[in-house]
Curated annotation (Swiss-Prot):
Subunit comment: Part of the 30S ribosomal subunit. Forms a bridge to the 50S subunit in the 70S ribosome, contacting the 23S rRNA.
SS bonds (residue pairs): none
One GO CC term on file: cytosolic small ribosomal subunit
Protein name (Swiss-Prot/TrEMBL): Small ribosomal subunit protein uS15
InterPro entries cross-referenced by the UniProt entry: Ribosomal_uS15 (IPR000589), Ribosomal_uS15_bac-type (IPR005290), uS15_NS1_RNA-bd_sf (IPR009068)
Function: One of the primary rRNA binding proteins, it binds directly to 16S rRNA where it helps nucleate assembly of the platform of the 30S subunit by binding and bridging several RNA helices of the 16S rRNA. Forms an intersubunit bridge (bridge B4) with the 23S rRNA of the 50S subunit in the ribosome.
């Protein structure tokens, strides 16, 4: 259900705005999106796992907050990010 360290490192290098960047909204949203996609696949097999579903809703909420922040600060970066990740907003 969690993402591997190699996948997380690949996401960081792909969405980083500068070298060593792990805290930018783009990187955080990319990592959260990967975790959300993994959990969504988990629920196809485990429909009654309500404990993990609550965690999924928490992840979606924090991703939405980061996306709202990014849209408020720099709308061009926001539209580029949601296009790259394929997020419907």
């Amino acid at each position: 259900m969690s993402i591997t360290a190699e996948r997380k490192a690949a996401l960081i290098t792909e969405y980083a705005t500068k070298a060593g960047d792990t805290g930018s909204p783009e990187v955080q949203v990319a990592i959260l999106t990967e975790r959300i996609n993994n959990l969504t696949g988990h629920f196809k097999d485990h429909k009654k796992d309500n404990h993990s579903r609550r965690g999924l809703l928490t992840l979606v909420s924090s991703r939405r907050s980061l996306l709202d922040y990014l849209k408020k600060k720099d709308e061009a970066r926001y539209t580029k990010l949601i296009g790259a990740l394929g997020i419907r907003r």
